[in-house]
Amino acid sequence: MASVKKIVDKMKRQPNGISPDEAGQVLDHYGYKFDRQSGSHKTYINKNGDVQTVPKKRPTIKPVYVKQILSKIGE
């Protein structure tokens, strides 16, 4: 597995090539915990109640989700 720092760098450089597992790994590292799965989306929540959904059905997630994650982790 790649380190979280490498994944975040990849998210900044190439936001359209991030897998759902990589996104989940980054969210876990920054304090988000897997909450539930509903349909084709996984839901992560942090201790402040901030929620981030990540689609799991496609091999890569759309850039809009990557931008949301980067914004929420402060990058």
Give the location of each predicted region.
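Major-groove recognition helix of helix-turn-helix-like DNA-binding domains
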Residues: 40-42
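Active-site beta-strand termini and strand-to-loop segments that position acidic
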Residues: 44-48
